[in-house]
Every structure is written in structure tokens, then in C-alpha cells.
């Protein structure tokens, strides 16, 4: 396991689940529930992975334009109601770039708060209408998570984690990630969009079954 993992087990059959998300993607927040419902009793290591839907200088979306209200009315709000998730289209305009928030994620990961950071950032934007593109807002959230606010702000101002974030984006490109959320389960199963608990659970159990068969078909130094 590493600092980015939310692990519910420590056995050799632990299945990795990589989740690429962006903090301004409502479907990433909606994916949290199915993910945890499917895996709460399974041996998995969940790692949230950075992905910028609209990196600078690509213009970000504006809630007063037609697109966001339309997609929220057609897809986000109906799904959220079915899932019982409290989520609201933020009024922050234009929507923030998320590079700085993701550099903050790298700081959080290095200081043992990666698992809490991504869900907290999603709640800050979609439930609290906070501008997560602002350093002062990010620093307040970091303090809420028990991180050193001064050290956090200093690191982001200095660009200490810029290279780590750029490497994370290269990893996303290597996995051919183009949408958020994207889940890679055990390096074998790929799910794009909000998954159902059944999809995730089946993928994890299938991999664990394959691991069990592979382990059973070998002899160790102490016998077969």
C-alpha cells in the first residue's frame, strides 16, 4: 500500500482500483457511493488519480451558459436523486482550473491524507460552492484535513509539486484516460463513467478468483 491508498485489506490478494477524477466533475462525486458500497468488505486498495478535464489555457465552463444547466437537469440531478446524493451545480464562474488543487493533492499524499483529500475537495465544490481554484480556499481545506496550512500554501506557491502533478498527468495519458471518472481495476478491468456497485464488485471478485487459481497451481519450497 502507499499513502494514496484507501485499503480495506492487507492480504496478498489485494486488488488495486485506480480512479481518475477531476474535482469539477459531478460524476466523480457520484462515483464515490458505488465504489465504497461495492468494496467495503473486499480486499482492495483505492487510489484517486489526477485528471484535468480542461487544463489551462482551455476555457473552463460557466454555469450561466446553456451547457451546464442542461447537462445537470438531464443527467446529474436525476442520477443524484436516485442515489440519494446531495449535490448542486456550483455558481462559481467560470469554473476553476484544478491544477493547483491537484498539486495540493500531491502534498496531501506525501503527508498521509490522500484518501481524505479527493472526497473533501469534491464536497467543497459541489456541496459548499467553494472556489477550489483559490489558494486560500485550498489552504483552509488542507487545515480541515489536519495538514499544516502554512506548509501547504508555501509548497503550492513555490510549485513544489508541479513536477509530481505533471508526472501524474503523463500516467493518465499512458492509461489512455480521456473521461472522468475512469476506473482501472486490477490493471485488467476498465470502467468509464459512474459505475454500478455490481460492476465494480464483479471485477474485483473475478480478479481475486483468478489470483486464487494461479496461487493454487504452484508449489512452494515447503510442498504443494
What label would you give each PLM region?
Residues 2, 27-39, 67, 120-224:
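C-terminal cap of thioredoxin/glutaredoxin-like
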Residues 4-14:
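Compositionally biased, intrinsically disordered low-complexity segments enriched
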Residues 29-125, 218-220, 224:
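Structural alpha/beta surface segment adjacent to cysteine/selenocysteine redox centers
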Residues 14, 101, 179-180:
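A structure-centric signal for secondary-structure junctions around beta-strands
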Residues 12-35:
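Local sequence-structure signature of Cys/Sec-based thiol-disulfide redox active-site neighborhoods
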Amino acid at each position: 500500500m502507499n499513502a494514496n491508498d484507501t485499503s480495506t485489506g492487507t492480504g496478498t490478494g489485494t486488488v488495486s482500483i485506480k480512479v481518475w477524477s477531476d474535482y469539477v466533475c459531478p460524476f466523480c462525486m457520484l462515483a464515490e457511493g458505488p465504489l465504497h458500497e461495492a468494496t467495503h468488505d473486499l480486499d482492495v486498495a483505492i487510489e484517486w488519480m489526477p485528471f484535468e478535464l480542461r487544463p489551462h489555457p482551455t476555457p473552463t465552463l460557466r454555469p450561466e451558459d446553456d451547457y451546464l444547466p442542461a447537462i445537470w437537469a438531464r443527467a446529474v440531478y436525476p442520477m443524484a436523486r436516485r442515489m440519494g446524493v446531495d449535490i448542486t451545480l456550483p455558481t462559481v464562474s467560470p469554473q476553476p482550473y484544478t491544477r493547483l488543487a491537484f498539486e495540493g493533492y500531491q502534498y496531501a499524499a506525501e503527508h498521509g491524507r490522500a484518501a481524505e483529500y479527493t472526497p473533501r475537495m469534491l464536497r467543497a465544490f459541489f456541496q459548499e460552492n467553494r472556489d477550489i481554484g483559490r489558494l486560500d480556499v485550498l489552504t483552509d481545506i488542507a487545515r480541515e484535513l489536519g495538514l499544516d496550512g502554512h506548509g501547504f500554501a508555501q509548497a503550492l506557491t513555490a510549485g513544489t509539486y508541479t513536477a509530481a502533478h505533471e508526472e501524474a498527468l503523463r500516467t493518465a495519458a499512458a492509461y489512455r484516460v480521456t473521461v472522468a471518472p475512469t476506473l482501472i481495476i486490477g490493471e485488467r478491468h476498465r470502467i468509464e463513467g459512474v459505475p454500478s456497485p455490481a460492476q465494480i464488485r464483479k471485477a474485483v471478485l473475478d480478479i481475486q478468483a483468478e489470483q486464487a487459481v494461479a496461487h493454487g497451481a504452484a508449489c512452494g519450497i515447503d510442498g504443494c
